[in-house]
């Protein structure tokens, strides 16, 4: 059976759940952003269309290429043999998603794609297929990402999340696929393995969670409820196979003894829920009735699962915030008093309501209901559940919000962030960089550095002068956190903080925390692991971006010695250009991190050398010669692992001489340090050809801090 590559899209946040769902269908897939990808047959793809509760679109991958202008786009689309995919008498429509650096108008992309397809058919058959935006035979999807265009052929014409049962809905509807996702995440599939599974939704609204739970309990394939479902009319479509699989799905439904109950205080939405339940054909397992959540009672003989998506106040309470918070406080009390042993999951974007429940969460997961970001809070009702606990993050948020009310001087900081971002945008678009310095103590009263790492912020507070009131300094720091959250639209949990001060000895290598959470970032053609929480620095020095490129270019297909290599980022860039690298550092932790960076970039770390050693001692005994050496020592170090204290101003002459002893006669030594008052030794200037390359190595985002480092290119005379 012919194999294809398929991408199955879903709402952001449920990718892993979708991957697990496909595993249960016997399909192995890879998790991607907003979906999963798998290699398989048309039959496999049909199974996803029929049985998936979580998928939005099942798409056959047609082609991917880099395009930089409209002619490129036209030629790329024309290079695809569309007659292999559908006949000229079949209609189609085009949908566009994502963003492209060079195409701001998606209508233009759609028109150019349509022209290329139609022209191809006309040139070969003297006929052209027609566009049908309402009821097409086929849907072609283009996903734009940076300068790449990915082309897909959709198997399902309309989104799979539509089940057709929801004829009547409230003001804040929950997508069917998201309802299914939170049920699965909350443990409903495990609950169904019990003799008598129990599910309660105490704020059921129009009944979406109840119905999705019943469909799973009765093993009803979601596609069977979608009366308007239409499979693609491609040359790859096998109608007989599709019909057979649908028949198998119909015969796989089962009787269940699950108890599924819904409650709501609003009779109007309960009436809608009842009609939706009948529409779905699951009235035999669901009961609904009017009840205030504050009066919720446990009338069941065994423990079960409570899953709910509260109305956030839009539907019932409007701006009556106090009333809404009282409801959640009462809900929390009822749970702790009468539902011992139960598991609870609450999906909401209103965090204050969760605080009012005064229950300890066991897990939190981010989901998206359309564009609305929500959190699924999970609880286990036991003797430890009733606990009013403020996490460090919650404390930081509380202090930040309060600090913002104490003065308005942080408005200048916010305006500077906006101005800097506007100034950097053209350069960021040109380079494609996602990690950069946005702010560096531009306003003296806000002595912080703001580094952007895609959706994360690394906020470094410069140690305040002894003459500055520490309380005022602390207040300004929290005001900075508040404005980064508000102005840059960064989630509080993605703002990571540090106080910059001189580190001594082993402090330079010790962990700050032990969260052990790594993130992947991109820098040009390389990827790196960064850690915002556990170490003093993140794992990459953004100000060394340009010198890393110089080193990599010079070391292309040559040998590189990287001294004080840290996490080996320069070595990775060089290795990607064919260099054979040797990285030397005192810290085994950072060398292991470096090896992981090599692996992340699909580079065989075994073909490169990683040496844990004091660089000075190692250089004294090294006999090998290298084409390029990158020497980037710390300003000061008195680590016990070193034979002596390192002071870069005092010791740079020794370091450079030792490094030059390991350099080939026609080689290049790149020397860098961050000591602001650094002066190059006259003896070194006399002995070697030394060129200061500070300006060359200064990136656009560090222009406001021109003394951030000293960079030299050194060669033999």
Curated annotation (Swiss-Prot):
<dbReference type="Pfam" id="PF01170">
    <property type="entry name" value="UPF0020"/>
</dbReference>
<dbReference type="InterPro" id="IPR017244">
    <property type="entry name" value="23SrRNA_methyltr_KL"/>
</dbReference>
<dbReference type="GO" id="GO:0005737">
    <property type="term" value="C:cytoplasm"/>
</dbReference>
<dbReference type="InterPro" id="IPR054170">
    <property type="entry name" value="RlmL_1st"/>
</dbReference>
<comment type="function">
    <text>Specifically methylates the guanine in position 2445 (m2G2445) and the guanine in position 2069 (m7G2069) of 23S rRNA.</text>
</comment>
<dbReference type="Pfam" id="PF02926">
    <property type="entry name" value="THUMP"/>
</dbReference>
<feature type="domain" description="THUMP">
    <location>
        <begin position="44"/>
        <end position="155"/>
    </location>
</feature>
<dbReference type="GO" id="GO:0070043">
    <property type="term" value="F:rRNA (guanine-N7-)-methyltransferase activity"/>
</dbReference>
<keyword id="KW-0963">Cytoplasm</keyword>
<dbReference type="GO" id="GO:0003723">
    <property type="term" value="F:RNA binding"/>
</dbReference>
<dbReference type="InterPro" id="IPR019614">
    <property type="entry name" value="SAM-dep_methyl-trfase"/>
</dbReference>
<dbReference type="InterPro" id="IPR002052">
    <property type="entry name" value="DNA_methylase_N6_adenine_CS"/>
</dbReference>
<keyword id="KW-0489">Methyltransferase</keyword>
<dbReference type="InterPro" id="IPR004114">
    <property type="entry name" value="THUMP_dom"/>
</dbReference>
<keyword id="KW-0949">S-adenosyl-L-methionine</keyword>
<dbReference type="InterPro" id="IPR029063">
    <property type="entry name" value="SAM-dependent_MTases_sf"/>
</dbReference>
<comment type="similarity">
    <text>Belongs to the methyltransferase superfamily. RlmKL family.</text>
</comment>
<dbReference type="InterPro" id="IPR000241">
    <property type="entry name" value="RlmKL-like_Mtase"/>
</dbReference>
<protein>
    <recommendedName>
        <fullName>Ribosomal RNA large subunit methyltransferase K/L</fullName>
        <ecNumber>2.1.1.173</ecNumber>
        <ecNumber>2.1.1.264</ecNumber>
    </recommendedName>
</protein>
<keyword id="KW-0808">Transferase</keyword>
<dbReference type="Pfam" id="PF22020">
    <property type="entry name" value="RlmL_1st"/>
</dbReference>
<dbReference type="GO" id="GO:0052915">
    <property type="term" value="F:23S rRNA (guanine(2445)-N(2))-methyltransferase activity"/>
</dbReference>
<keyword id="KW-0698">rRNA processing</keyword>
<keyword id="KW-0694">RNA-binding</keyword>
<dbReference type="Pfam" id="PF10672">
    <property type="entry name" value="Methyltrans_SAM"/>
</dbReference>
<dbReference type="InterPro" id="IPR053943">
    <property type="entry name" value="RlmKL-like_Mtase_CS"/>
</dbReference>
């Amino acid at each position: 059976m012919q194999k294809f590559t398929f991408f199955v899209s879903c709402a952001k946040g449920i990718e892993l759940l979708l991957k697990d769902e496909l595993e249960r269908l016997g399909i192995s897939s890879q998790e991607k952003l907003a979906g999963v990808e798998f290699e398989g047959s048309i039959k496999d793809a049909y199974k996803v269309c029929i049985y998936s509760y979580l998928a939005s679109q099942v798409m056959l991958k047609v082609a991917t290429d880099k395009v930089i202008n409209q002619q490129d786009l036209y030629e790329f689309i024309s290079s695809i043999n569309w007659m292999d995919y559908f006949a000229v008498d079949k209609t189609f429509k085009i949908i566009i998603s994502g963003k492209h650096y060079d195409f701001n108008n998606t209508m233009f992309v759609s028109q150019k794609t349509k022209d290329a397809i139609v022209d191809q058919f006309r040139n070969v058959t003297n006929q052209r297929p027609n566009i049908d935006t309402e009821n097409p035979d086929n849907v072609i999807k283009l996903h734009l990402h940076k300068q790449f265009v990915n082309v897909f052929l959709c198997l399902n014409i309309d989104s799979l999340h539509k089940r057709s049962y929801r004829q009547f809905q409230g003001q804040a509807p929950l997508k069917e696929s998201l309802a299914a996702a939170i049920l699965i995440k909350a443990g409903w599939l495990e609950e169904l393995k019990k003799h008598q599974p129990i599910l309660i939704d105490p704020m059921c609204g129009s009944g979406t969670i109840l119905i999705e739970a019943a469909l799973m309990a009765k093993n009803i394939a979601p596609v069977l409820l979608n009366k308007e479902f239409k499979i693609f009319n491609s040359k790859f479509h096998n109608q007989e196979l599709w019909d057979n699989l649908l028949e198998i799905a119909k015969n796989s439904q089962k009787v269940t003894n699950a108890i599924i109950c819904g409650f709501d205080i609003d009779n109007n939405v309960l009436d809608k829920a009842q009609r939706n339940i009948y529409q779905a054909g699951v009235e035999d397992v669901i009961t609904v009735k009017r009840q205030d959540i504050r009066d919720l009672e446990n009338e069941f003989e065994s423990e079960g699962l409570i899953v709910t998506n509260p109305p956030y106040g839009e539907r019932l309470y409007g701006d009556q915030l106090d009333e809404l918070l009282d409801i959640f406080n009462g809900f929390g009390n009822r749970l702790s008093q009468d539902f011992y042993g139960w598991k609870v999951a609450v999906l909401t974007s209103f965090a204050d309501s969760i605080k009012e429940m005064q229950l300890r969460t066991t897990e939190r997961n981010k989901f998206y209901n359309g564009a609305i970001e929500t959190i699924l809070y999970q609880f286990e009702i036991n003797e430890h559940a009733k606990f009013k606990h403020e996490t460090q993050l919650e404390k930081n948020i509380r202090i930040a919000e309060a600090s913002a009310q104490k003065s308005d001087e942080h408005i200048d900081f916010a305006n500077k962030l906006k101005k800097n971002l506007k100034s950097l945008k053209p350069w960021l678009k040109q380079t494609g960089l996602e990690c950069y310095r946005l702010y560096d103590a531009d306003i003296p009263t806000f002595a912080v550095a703001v580094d952007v790492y895609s959706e994360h912020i690394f906020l470094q507070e410069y140690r305040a002068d002894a003459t500055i009131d520490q309380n005022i300094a602390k207040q300004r720091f929290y005001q900075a956190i508040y404005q980064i959250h508000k102005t840059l639209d960064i989630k509080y949990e993605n703002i990571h903080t540090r106080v910059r001060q001189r580190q001594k000895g082993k402090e330079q290598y010790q962990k700050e925390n032990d969260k052990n959470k790594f993130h992947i970032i991109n820098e040009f053609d390389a990827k790196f692991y960064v850690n915002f929480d556990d170490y003093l620095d993140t794992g990459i020095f953004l100000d060394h971006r340009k010198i890393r490129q110089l080193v990599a270019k010079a070391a292309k297909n040559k040998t590189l010695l990287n001294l004080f290599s840290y996490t080996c980022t320069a070595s990775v860039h060089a290795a990607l250009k064919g260099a054979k690298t040797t990285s030397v550092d005192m810290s085994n932790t950072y060398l292991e991190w470096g090896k992981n960076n090599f692996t992340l970039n699909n580079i065989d770390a075994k073909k490169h050398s990683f040496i844990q050693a004091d660089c000075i001692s190692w250089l004294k005994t090294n006999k090998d010669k290298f084409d390029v050496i990158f020497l980037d020592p710390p300003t000061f170090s008195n680590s016990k692992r070193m034979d002596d204290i390192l002071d870069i101003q005092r010791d740079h002459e020794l370091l450079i001489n030792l490094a030059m002893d390991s350099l080939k006669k026609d080689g290049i030594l790149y020397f860098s340090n961050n000591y602001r008052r650094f002066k190059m030794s006259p003896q070194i200037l006399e002995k070697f050809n030394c060129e200061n390359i500070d300006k060359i190595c200064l990136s656009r985002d560090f222009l406001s801090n021109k003394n951030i480092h000293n960079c030299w290119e050194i060669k033999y005379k």
